């Protein structure tokens, strides 16, 4: 078997790109061939796949069980990302809650818990590993992988990571999970760290997880592969199906196989994972369609925004949580606007991230991963608000930042601004910073949750109901699920052009008495529907990112930039150039075909393509048109 293996990080694709908005059934329906591709494992749970299911009005346990049970039925090794003591929430929990949660997931069929704490504090991981060991002794097939959070950060050094690795293994973790939620990472750092981990821990394998936000993930993965294959060791890379890859998620499994096979070192290119291309293709259209339906939840690309995020070490999507703060976006839009017009969301985000890069040092450079990422960005937004209204940057502190500053979330960096710590201590009415309380030393929470549920009308509360009550903190939601009165969020309505056309029986007939009158819906369906529109949009974005030199290519594979660029140009040319023929083959008359492609009016195929492409980034459609024209000019000349 190949030394280089893949984990399909499905959960994070849905979370990072689509905001955990699709239901479990939508995910399953869109990815029918996941188990056939040949990946070593699939991450099906964890992260926001609990609280956000609930916030969307869904019964979180039904959603989780549906996903895990489906993949278990197909014999898939499954993992879940778990936030140590924080589980799938934003506050540390006592051991009785942790134990019951771990046992529930073990019973469902989760095999690997990738357990992390953003500041690499081992105290916050004690509960999960203890519960996993108890589950193992009860016969469950489950392990806890020890996570080391990494990024370009003065708090994160090779030496500190190695010291933390010793603690992880001593605690009983099995293998290492190198996690970079921000994607701000140096491939050289990855190579040195993985080399040292393999040398110092010869019995432990490594999985690496890097987001694609800043284009550094492929080079970091190859750096880890070099360290592994030089030693004949296994390395697992977190990848996405091509239709869920890129942007703020992870690299495409197809792209990574290409990089591995193209690598000049035989030790690497001979260890490419063997994936089933037919199985990958088998879910391409349905996943692109899912991504199209939930496209409004994806961040829009601009080089200026990415630059601001990069300087802030921002994890993609952290700013989305700001929209839930009453009045914040409206006030920032007003204060940043010009000529009595509100600033758009892109402008607001850029300003927030510029502020974030400014305050990181005062905050002690917290690692940009949950819950620190959302809390840092939340403080940046509030500090920007204060600055624009002439107040001190830290006039008020974001609630999550207060908890971090006083030690309630774990380790506090030495470099933190002591004045901010004093302010947070005062806000919390404390005398000093708090010592982090290990989960086993916290008072049990399940008995109180049970009592509250009984008082609310649940006669015999289940373990799952008690866990939801504690973790989500929304008693009304738990009761609604119990009484089956919860109202799950409905899927977004598609734009008119992407909706199902009228049936033949309902179509009007032209004056000639025989020609069916067809509208834009028929034309879009004929060319491939929303899946083709989304594929065009993703390829357009990829072209722009390559043009902006977003991607860092591994040494010896720099030529792939031109190959990837030209391959996208060719595919886009074929997709766009075949429209007339497709319409003709589908029975459109010449006049109907011309009408559907006219450039002098609205509601034509190219307007629909423009709408799809510009959702990925303002002005992206015009960029693609110019790129295609430039390519034709070069060919003709």
Predicted regions and their residues:
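N-terminal amphipathic alpha-helix/helix-capping segment at the start of soluble metabolic enzymes
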Residues: 1-17
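Hydrophobic faces of well-ordered beta-strands that scaffold small-molecule active sites
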Residues: 5-8, 42-44, 76-83, 113-114, ...
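Terminal or standalone catalytic/regulatory effector modules within metabolic enzymes
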Residues: 11, 35-36, 40-53, 302-637
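Conserved, mostly hydrophobic/aromatic
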Residues: 13, 115, 176, 228
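Surface-exposed amphipathic alpha-helices with a cationic face
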Residues: 64-72, 126-140, 194-202, 257, ...
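Catalytic alpha/beta core domains of metabolic enzymes, predominantly
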Residues: 181-355, 359-391
């Amino acid at each position: 078997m190949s030394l280089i293996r893949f984990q399909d990080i499905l959960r994070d694709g849905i979370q990072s790109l689509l905001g955990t908005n699709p239901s479990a059934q939508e995910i399953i329906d869109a990815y029918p061939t996941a188990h056939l591709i040949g990946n070593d494992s699939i991450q099906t749970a964890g992260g926001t796949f609990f609280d956000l299911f609930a916030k969307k009005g869904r019964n979180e346990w039904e959603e989780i069980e549906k996903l895990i049970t489906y993949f278990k039925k197909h014999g898939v090794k499954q993992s879940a990302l778990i936030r140590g003591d924080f589980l799938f929430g934003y506050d540390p929990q006592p051991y009785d809650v942790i134990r019951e949660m771990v046992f529930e997931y073990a019973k469902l069929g989760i095999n690997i818990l990738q357990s992390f704490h953003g500041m690499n504090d081992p105290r916050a991981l004690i509960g999960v590993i203890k519960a996993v060991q108890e589950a193992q002794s009860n016969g469950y097939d489950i392990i806890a992988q020890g996570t080391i959070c990494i990024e370009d950060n003065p708090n994160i050094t090779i030496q500190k990571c190695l010291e933390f690795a010793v603690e992880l293994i001593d605690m009983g973790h099995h293998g290492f999970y190198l996690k970079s939620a921000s994607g701000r990472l140096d491939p050289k750092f990855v190579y040195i760290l993985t080399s040292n981990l393999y040398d110092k821990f010869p019995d432990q394998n490594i999985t690496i997880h890097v987001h694609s936000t800043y284009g550094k993930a492929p080079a970091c993965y190859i750096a880890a592969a070099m360290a592994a294959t030089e030693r004949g060791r296994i390395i697992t890379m977190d990848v996405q199906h091509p239709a869920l890859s890129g942007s703020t998620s992870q690299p495409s499994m197809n792209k990574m196989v290409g990089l591995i096979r193209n690598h000049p070192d035989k030790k690497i290119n001979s260890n490419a994972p063997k994936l089933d291309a037919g199985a990958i293709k088998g879910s391409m259209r349905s996943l692109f369609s899912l991504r199209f339906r939930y496209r409004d939840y994806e961040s829009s690309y601009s080089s200026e925004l990415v630059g601001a995020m990069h300087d802030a070490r921002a994890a993609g999507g952290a700013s989305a949580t700001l929209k839930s703060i009453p009045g914040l976006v409206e006030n920032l839009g007003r204060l940043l606007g010009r000529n009595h017009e509100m600033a758009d969301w892109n402008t607001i985000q850029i300003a927030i991230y510029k502020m974030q890069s400014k305050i990181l040092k005062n905050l002690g450079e917290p690692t940009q991963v949950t819950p620190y990422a959302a809390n840092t960005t939340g403080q940046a937004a509030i500090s920007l608000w204060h600055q624009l209204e002439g107040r001190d940057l830290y006039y008020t502190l974001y609630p999550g930042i207060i908890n971090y500053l006083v030690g309630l979330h774990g380790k506090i960096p030495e470099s933190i601004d002591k004045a901010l710590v004093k302010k947070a201590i005062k806000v919390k009415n404390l005398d000093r910073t708090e010592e982090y309380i290990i989960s086993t030393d916290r008072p049990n929470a399940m008995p109180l949750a049970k009592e509250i549920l009984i008082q609310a009308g649940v006669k015999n509360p289940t373990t799952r109901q008690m866990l939801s009550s504690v973790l989500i903190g929304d008693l009304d939601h738990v009761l609604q699920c119990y009484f089956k009165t919860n109202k799950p969020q409905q899927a977004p309505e598609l734009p008119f052009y992407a909706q199902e056309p009228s049936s033949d029986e309902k179509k009007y007939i032209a004056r000639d008495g025989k020609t069916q009158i067809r509208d834009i819906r028929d034309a879009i369906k004929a060319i491939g529907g929303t899946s083709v529109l989304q594929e065009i949009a993703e390829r357009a974005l990829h072209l722009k990112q390559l043009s902006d030199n977003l991607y860092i290519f591994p040494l010896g594979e720099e030529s792939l930039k031109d190959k990837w660029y030209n391959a996208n140009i060719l595919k886009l040319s074929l997709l766009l150039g075949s429209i007339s023929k497709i319409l003709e083959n589908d029975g459109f008359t010449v006049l109907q075909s011309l009408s559907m492609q006219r450039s002098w009016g609205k509601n034509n195929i190219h307007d629909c393509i423009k709408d799809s492409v510009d959702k990925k980034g303002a002005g992206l459609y015009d960029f693609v048109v110019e790129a295609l024209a430039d390519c034709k000019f070069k060919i003709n000349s």
